[in-house]
Amino acid sequence: MNYDFDTVTDRKNTNAIKYDLAKKRGKPEDAVSLWVADMDFPTAPCIQKAVAEKAAHGIWGYSRPDNRYYDALKKWYKERHNFEVQNEWVVNTPGVCFALATAVKAFTNEGESVLIQKPVYYPFFNITNSLQRKVVNSSLILKNNHYEIDFDDFERKIVQENVKMFILCSPHNPGGRVWTKQELQKISEICLAHNVLVVSDEIHSDITFGSNVHTVYGSLSEQALKNSIICTAPSKSFNLAGLQFSNIFIADEKLRKAFSEELDKTGYDEPSVFGIVAATAAYSEGADWFDSVKSYIWENILFAKKYIEENASQIKVLVPEGTYLLWLDFSKTGLSDSEINDRVLNKAKVWLDSGSMFGKEGEKFQRINCATPRIILEDALKRICSQF
């Protein structure tokens, strides 16, 4: 089936934070918004149909997933990731960040250490800090436009800081790495050796390109499976973030019980009725749409790389192995981080995520969302390149 990803859908005045928060956050209201990680495409027709039918039913009371959801979820992970999910492993939460916070509260105490790898998705350290845990950082190493893990530093920090939990970003946001099985196995070996629980944020796991293959952390070994909390959701793959629905895989019964007990303390019980319906439709009927949108996004990424190389060659493009996020390196411009931010936001009038939001290691970088109609992406690139 052919899908139209070129038509622009006006999202202004729809309560979309990507567009309607500009004034509140002091951003130019005429800026092109490519900051937050949601798509500018309507979701798959099969999902729209399923949600519309549920809306027409008119009764949206407390709901829980049934076997249609579990069967679709298991089929998706088996076919896409060769990972066999068991029904009892699945805990639903209203978002992956909610699950991260729940895990930090359930498995660490105030003052204990949680390891992350900057530059990284900023809720990792914002949530950890807000819960009065100690953030320990093992910075990724950038070599030839490619991030690598410093395993010596990784293990040293775990030992020195008595780390209790490691939050893994897989695939990596914002750097776009799809970690190899060998890299993940090394992480697992170190964490198992030092009794460090792994919380793996795999929300972008479906979105990989070329020969890059996502490895579900729990597929590494039985020990890795039982020492991990794997956070997944249909939100990035199918543009469903606003429905607040995630699938958290916890194979170990004791971990799952502790996580669920912490979840209960928040007052959260049943997931969104529309989240259940949308996720079920996505995983059971959405494959063709997803494959099409992923191809379109990859074409956008290649378009952006070529455009920047031809019009602002001092900006270096880190081509992602996964995610629809492009990480742009402005360090060769000779400008300071604040000067780069000012040129992009106030002169080019493009609202991106400043790299410094992801940690000091992200200074002089900008993150741009490529899940948008090409005409919007081209407009943003023209504006940016005109200032550098």
Predicted features and spans:
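Conserved core of the PLP fold type I
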Residues: 60-189, 206-207, 214-219, 223
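Conserved glycine-rich beta-strand-loop-beta hairpin in the small C-terminal domain of fold type I
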Residues: 280, 296-305, 317-330, 362
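Conserved core segment of the aminotransferase class I/II
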Residues: 49-50, 222, 226-298, 306, ...
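PLP-dependent enzyme catalytic core of the Aspartate aminotransferase-like
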Residues: 334-336, 343-352, 358-388
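Helix C-cap/helix->beta junction micro-motif
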Residues: 131, 161, 193-194, 311, ...
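N-terminal small-domain helix-loop-helix segment of the aminotransferase-like
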Residues: 2-95, 102
